């Protein structure tokens, strides 16, 4: 069996240090907000905090800001089909992206993604979910690192151990949760 020392990815929509999880072990932050204009002072402050705490800091879909502020990498959502690899310094920055099926996974590989978020793992209010068997079958065809995303909650966090994955992620899983959920999640 493999170890359960998984990389944890937290999506944030606010450039506020208080929104970051208290447990920073193996944590990476993805800033994802398409409605607000980025305030450079806040972005620099968060970048410095992440560097000090050894947290990787990615920005979603904003290649100019990724280059300008020399962030750890770029997150490409599943709806972005552009090829951005020519613009980034791939020696210093990592491209990560999300996908829902084989076609989107191939597109993310073409875009140069080193880590692919495959979603949704469990039932969510939006999409048809993969669940454990289909998730494993989908990722078997590819050699990339995969992160489980979507629908992970208190009732199904233990099922993640059945996956051979690089990391785990969530959008709402880091927001005010019961102590039992945080304890179960922190075991990873």
Predicted features along the sequence, with ranges:
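Hydrophobic faces of well-ordered beta-strands that scaffold small-molecule active sites
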Residues: 4-12, 27-31, 57-59, 74-76, ...
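Conserved, mostly hydrophobic/aromatic
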Residues: 29, 66, 108, 116, ...
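N-terminal targeting/leader regions
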Residues: 1-24, 33, 44
């Amino acid at each position: 069996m493999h170890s359960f020392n998984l990389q944890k990815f937290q999506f944030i929509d606010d450039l506020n240090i208080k929104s970051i999880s208290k447990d920073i072990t193996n944590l990476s932050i993805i800033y994802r907000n398409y409605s607000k204009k980025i305030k450079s002072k806040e972005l620099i402050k968060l970048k410095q905090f992440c560097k000090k705490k050894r947290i990787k800091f990615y920005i979603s879909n904003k290649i100019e800001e990724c280059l300008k502020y020399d962030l750890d990498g770029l997150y490409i959502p599943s709806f972005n089909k552009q090829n951005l690899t020519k613009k980034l310094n791939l020696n210093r920055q990592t491209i990560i992206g999300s996908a829902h099926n084989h076609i989107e996974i191939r597109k993310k590989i073409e875009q140069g993604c080193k880590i692919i978020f495959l979603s949704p793992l469990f039932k969510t209010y939006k999409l048809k979910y993969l669940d454990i068997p289909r998730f494993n079958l989908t990722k078997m065809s590819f050699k990339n690192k995969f992160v489980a995303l979507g629908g992970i909650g208190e009732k199904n966090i233990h099922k993640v151990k059945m996956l051979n994955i690089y990391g785990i992620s969530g959008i709402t899983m880091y927001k005010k949760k019961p102590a039992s959920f945080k304890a179960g999640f922190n075991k990873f």
